[in-house]
Structure formats: C-alpha cells, structure tokens
Amino acid sequence: MMHVNSETGVGQPIEEVGNALASTKTYFHIDATQGFGKLNDSLRSTKYDMLSITAHKLGGPQGIGALILKRDGMYRRPPITPLMFGGQQERGYRPGTTPVALVAGFALAAELCDKEAAEHMAACKRVKENILDQLQGLDYTINGDQENCLPTTLNISFHGVDAEGIFLAVKDHYAFSNGSACNSGSHAPSYVLTAMGLPENLINGAVRISWSYHTLIDLSALKNYTNSISEYC
C-alpha cells in the first residue's frame, strides 16, 4: 500500500489498515517512497511487516533504497525471495558489493530529514500557498483530499484547458507533468484520477506540480502564464 500517492500527494490510511491486519496472518507492505522523511510519525505508529524507502526523495543520492523487514518475535521475518542471484551479500537477498558511499549518503539524508521535518514542511507549505496565490481568478479544481495532502504536491485540473497546452505554455520556466515520474512517458489518462472517478474533462486538464524545501524559484512569472490560461477557463 502507498504511504502517500505520488500523483496527488494524498496520504493513505496506513495506520487503520495496519491495525485491521494486525490480528491476521496477512503481510502488510508499505511503499513509503513519497512519505518517508515527511510523515515519519505515522510510520512509527503503524503496524507493518515491510517498508520500502528511497534516498533521492530525501535529497540523498540516487540509486540507493531500502526494504525494511520487521521481525515477528525473535526470529520470524516476512518470507521474501531474491530477484537477483550471485553473491551472498545482504543475507543472500541482493548480490553485489554494497555501495558504501550511497549507503552513507542515504543514512545522513534520513537523519537530517527526521530532525528537520517540521522546518522542511513549513517551507514547502509556503511554496504551495504562493502557487495558489498566483492561480487566483482561474477556474480550477484541486484533485485529492487537501486535509490529508502533503504540502509538496498539487494536482490541479484547469477547466476547459487541455494539460498539454499548459505544458507548452510554461515549458521554458516550469516543469509540470500529467502524472508521477514513473508514468511521465505515458500518454494514457491518469489511472489514479480515473480510479478517483473524475470526469474526463478534469482528467484531461490535470497537471501535477511538485517541489521541495529547496525550491526557491520566482513564481511571479507564473502569473503571466495564468493570465493567458484564464482566457480559456
């Protein structure tokens, strides 16, 4: 189960699911790629068996991630099998020499994110507020439950405007997308927004905007583009 949806930024009810499964023999895996380092408190209080995380979402190095397995009792771990075979590194689950530099970078990024999470999220919230200020006057819908949304992502449908036209309008200054990076090469409608039951016109007009606490871009130019977009909304 996703911790945070990669297209809308909405957090999923992992604590409720974990509690519901705690008394069963079901193994619970959380893909925490989007939420780790941002919503660590919910991960600490959730009952899970497996947790997937990655470094580059924390500002750490690319090419390193981790699968955390929780023990049930002293010895019992969730039963997993390797996808690659060769050496017996990492208890035989993943062959190959451990990339020490990447591991160290991952560890430091995780430590800093945990320590500075509140500060980082406050900075991201300010960016989100600035973006929404620039979009005032436009006819749009924010997709996803904003009460449970990370302040690092906006999924917005502009009424009466195709997303491709918006991409072309802002491409020289801003990098918008119509989905998460893992689906950026797909021209099919967003399966996430489709599953949410959005009408076709909102799906076609949806753009995804994301940022981090490092984002220091000048958003004033966005107003110029939104003025031209408003002619079609």
For each of these PLM feature ranges, what is it?
Residues 154-208:
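Conserved C-terminal alpha-helix-loop-beta "cap" of PLP-dependent enzymes
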Residues 109-132, 141-150:
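Structural signature of PLP-dependent enzymes
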